[in-house]
């Protein structure tokens, strides 16, 4: 089940703070183009964001990162579940949109596998449009992808 929240944050200030973490080459994971920071610790998360997430999500923040997609950048289908033995219980993942200056900046698609006990390849994905201050929470074993950003501006 996907939970959809709208937070009330000063996004301009938050974006400035988060851009301080964009100071290295980042890492290559599911991102095809664009930038993904290295993993960051909970202590690094700006308090205004962490406090509002804590109000919405029952759980402990373990790690987070900054993702920036420019024109044509996308994220391939992936999940966040760690299957390395010993296998852990399924956790919670989320995405928070800070900067969404245009339309057509790449919807996030959640695959239908988590919606039914017997999914098929033909299950249509659940589609969510990026919007500023939108927080989406989902199980960490839920496969998801991001469509290409069709704008000349960056989405964060």
Predicted regions and their residues:
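Catalytic core of non-heme Fe(II) oxygenases with the double-stranded beta-helix
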Residues: 59-148, 153-156
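Non-heme Fe(II)/2-oxoglutarate
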Residues: 1-62, 72-75, 107
């Amino acid at each position: 089940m996907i939970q959809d929240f709208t937070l009330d944050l000063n996004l301009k200030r938050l974006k400035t703070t988060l851009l301080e973490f964009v100071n290295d080459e980042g890492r290559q994971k599911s991102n095809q183009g664009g930038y993904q920071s290295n993993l960051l610790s909970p202590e690094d998360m700006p308090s205004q964001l962490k406090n509002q997430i804590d109000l919405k999500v029952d759980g402990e923040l373990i790690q987070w990162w900054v993702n920036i997609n420019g024109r044509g950048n996308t994220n391939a289908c992936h999940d966040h579940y760690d299957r390395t033995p010993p296998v852990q219980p399924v956790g919670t993942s989320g995405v928070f949109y800070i900067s969404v200056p245009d339309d057509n900046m790449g919807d996030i698609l959640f695959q239908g596998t988590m919606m039914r006990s017997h999914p098929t390849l033909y299950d249509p994905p659940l589609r969510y449009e990026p919007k500023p201050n939108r927080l989406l929470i989902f199980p960490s074993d839920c496969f998801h992808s991001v469509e290409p950003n069709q704008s000349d501006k960056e989405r964060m």
